[in-house]
């Protein structure tokens, strides 16, 4: 397992437990393991109850954190992938298709970063091209045609900023998705599972409900990008994070996010199964409520929610 810098003391204890586990078991060894396990639990509770915003960002990028492809088979069944935007190509930074959630059909769409070097290149580190947003929109319109809910998973450092992407209409593709998603006639639930950065996240992030995993973040720009603009150096990222209000808890307070999905102690990377179960329960609960509304009720509530963002009062 990979450890972050603030987890060094936890690593020491877990290394000791692992070492003792390989020793011939006797009462003394067993007692020592129990003692260390209790100490580890208490230390983890203490550590993760007072994380800084920057530490949350670090957890959201943890190299062992579950990505969309890891969670997909743990949450949904009968997944049938659909490819291409029918205009240019098939962007593998986003994966989508038909699936079942608790035996009910849904259209599921998610950004995929890739785990190793080969897959990271294949999936372009989760940075979508215009054809990716158009593919996602094609699947959403298909879901609307067959009256299926849409569930999207957000995990991206941002939309791909390359010249070719701009030439193919990156900004238009994202803007088109914002427009179309705000008016879809089926329930739309969006979940941030890792990084939710800038327009790259918004392109599949407009819906009836926005959920976030506990240790994910949602921002208009990455902390490093913000620090580079304000302080001319990315090294100030940990400082600017505190004033960006990008963590799940803070965004829930600001009513940007509707629900925070709890993660296992230590983060989602420590228990994929529990993380997937928590997501499945949260999404199923949201879809149940949304499915009981009429199209008019859903769209009216969605409109009111979107129009409430960015309002302020002068003191």
Swiss-Prot record:
<keyword id="KW-0276">Fatty acid metabolism</keyword>
<comment type="subunit">
    <text>Acetyl-CoA carboxylase is a heterohexamer composed of biotin carboxyl carrier protein (AccB), biotin carboxylase (AccC) and two subunits each of ACCase subunit alpha (AccA) and ACCase subunit beta (AccD).</text>
</comment>
<dbReference type="InterPro" id="IPR011763">
    <property type="entry name" value="COA_CT_C"/>
</dbReference>
<dbReference type="GO" id="GO:0006633">
    <property type="term" value="P:fatty acid biosynthetic process"/>
</dbReference>
<dbReference type="GO" id="GO:0003989">
    <property type="term" value="F:acetyl-CoA carboxylase activity"/>
</dbReference>
<keyword id="KW-0963">Cytoplasm</keyword>
<keyword id="KW-0547">Nucleotide-binding</keyword>
<keyword id="KW-0443">Lipid metabolism</keyword>
<protein>
    <recommendedName>
        <fullName>Acetyl-coenzyme A carboxylase carboxyl transferase subunit alpha</fullName>
        <ecNumber>2.1.3.15</ecNumber>
    </recommendedName>
</protein>
<dbReference type="InterPro" id="IPR029045">
    <property type="entry name" value="ClpP/crotonase-like_dom_sf"/>
</dbReference>
<dbReference type="Pfam" id="PF03255">
    <property type="entry name" value="ACCA"/>
</dbReference>
<comment type="function">
    <text>Component of the acetyl coenzyme A carboxylase (ACC) complex. First, biotin carboxylase catalyzes the carboxylation of biotin on its carrier protein (BCCP) and then the CO(2) group is transferred by the carboxyltransferase to acetyl-CoA to form malonyl-CoA.</text>
</comment>
<keyword id="KW-0808">Transferase</keyword>
<keyword id="KW-0067">ATP-binding</keyword>
<dbReference type="GO" id="GO:0005524">
    <property type="term" value="F:ATP binding"/>
</dbReference>
<dbReference type="GO" id="GO:2001295">
    <property type="term" value="P:malonyl-CoA biosynthetic process"/>
</dbReference>
<dbReference type="InterPro" id="IPR001095">
    <property type="entry name" value="Acetyl_CoA_COase_a_su"/>
</dbReference>
<comment type="similarity">
    <text>Belongs to the AccA family.</text>
</comment>
<feature type="domain" description="CoA carboxyltransferase C-terminal">
    <location>
        <begin position="35"/>
        <end position="289"/>
    </location>
</feature>
<dbReference type="GO" id="GO:0009317">
    <property type="term" value="C:acetyl-CoA carboxylase complex"/>
</dbReference>
<keyword id="KW-0444">Lipid biosynthesis</keyword>
<comment type="pathway">
    <text>Lipid metabolism; malonyl-CoA biosynthesis; malonyl-CoA from acetyl-CoA: step 1/1.</text>
</comment>
<keyword id="KW-0275">Fatty acid biosynthesis</keyword>
<dbReference type="GO" id="GO:0016743">
    <property type="term" value="F:carboxyl- or carbamoyltransferase activity"/>
</dbReference>
